[in-house]
């Protein structure tokens, strides 16, 4: 059984707390504004019309899950840096980690379904299974999203058991001094953590990769058809393929980086106030923020809504 034990001082230098907090706060503010904006736009449309197209409904759920994730990360960082006695209580520590994993699972599932949905809309194959999925995806998507949430709850619940343990020692001697200090010790079962964590992200990551492969294969076939029948210039179908491939690749690469950062952070390989742990915190807060900006920039409707929002903000500030 692979166990990693690390420690964290109760008393730390001020810069070790303030700098990571400021950087993470900036990331979180950007992410909360971006994901909150998308959630409000599509949420308002859902209330007004009582229903949304499947793609917009997926974007609503994805942005809402990222908004919750961003808020939760901000709360966790605040407690970790400024209220360590509360955060490092064994039950509270497990609660923070379990909810973080659950929100990350939901985030990945919704992003995977969004990419699969647009892949099915763009790609054309004659295989019977593919044609059936293309016809049924709109009807099945609400059930698939609900199933994804249930799977995320089930898998993340295991993280509240025998993976993390925190205990405190109030009488750690200070070298060259007669006094003592308080230290928190973290024990992490890395084998169980790795097994459960990667088991939870395997299927949606596989869906991401398959969507990218199908898009690339379809684009290659479409390009060959164009070269044999026309001058080879781009058409709307090729533009749609290229846009979907770029978006899927961007999301996949960012999520892999985010997944590695989350695993390193939860495994407690580095100390709570170490440089590498601060880098992981920066990645975890920057990922939802960057994805929200990406969604707004690639969607014409959201871009127009964002310009209107900026216009209203400027008018308000001029009053």
UniProtKB/Swiss-Prot annotation:
Keywords: G-protein coupled receptor, Glycoprotein, Membrane, Receptor, Sensory transduction, Taste, Transducer, Transmembrane, Transmembrane helix
Protein's recorded name: Taste receptor type 2 member 40
PANTHER family in UniProt: TASTE RECEPTOR TYPE 2, TASTE RECEPTOR TYPE 2 MEMBER 40
Other known facts: Several bitter taste receptors are expressed in a single taste receptor cell.
Membrane topology: Multi-pass membrane protein
Record topological domains on the Extracellular side: 1-17, 88-98, 158-195, 273-276
The encoding gene: Tas2r40
Alphabetized Pfam families for the sequence: TAS2R (PF05296)
């Amino acid at each position: 059984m692979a166990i990693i034990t690390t420690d964290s001082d109760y008393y730390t230098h001020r810069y070790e707390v303030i700098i990571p907090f400021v950087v993470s706060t900036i990331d979180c503010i950007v992410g909360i504004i971006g994901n909150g904006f998308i959630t409000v736009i599509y949420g308002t449309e859902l209330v007004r019309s009582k229903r949304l197209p499947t793609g917009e409904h997926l974007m609503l759920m994805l942005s809402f899950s990222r908004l919750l994730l961003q808020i939760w990360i901000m709360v966790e960082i605040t407690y970790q840096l400024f209220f360590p006695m509360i955060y490092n209580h064994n039950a509270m520590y497990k609660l923070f980690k379990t909810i973080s994993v659950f929100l990350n699972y939901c985030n990945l599932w919704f992003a995977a379904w969004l990419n699969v949905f647009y892949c099915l809309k763009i790609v054309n194959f004659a295989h019977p299974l593919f044609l059936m999925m293309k016809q049924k995806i709109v009807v099945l998507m609400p059930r698939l999203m609900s199933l994804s949430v249930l799977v995320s709850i089930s898998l993340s619940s295991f993280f509240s058991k025998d993976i993390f343990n925190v205990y405190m020692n109030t009488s750690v001697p200070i070298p060259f001094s007669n006094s003592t200090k308080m230290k928190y010790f973290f024990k992490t079962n890395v084998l169980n953590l790795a097994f459960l964590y990667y088991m939870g992200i395997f299927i949606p990551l596989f869906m991401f990769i398959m969507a990218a492969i199908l898009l690339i294969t379809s684009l290659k076939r479409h390009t060959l058809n164009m070269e044999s029948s026309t001058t080879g210039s781009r058409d709307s179908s090729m533009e749609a393929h290229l846009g979907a491939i770029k978006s899927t690749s961007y999301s996949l690469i960012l999520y892999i980086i985010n997944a590695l950062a989350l695993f390193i952070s939860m495994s407690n390989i580095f100390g709570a106030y170490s440089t590498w742990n601060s880098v992981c915190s920066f990645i975890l807060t920057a990922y939802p923020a960057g994805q929200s900006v990406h969604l707004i920039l690639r969607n014409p409707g959201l871009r127009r809504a964002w310009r209107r929002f900026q216009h209203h903000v400027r008018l308000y500030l001029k009053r």
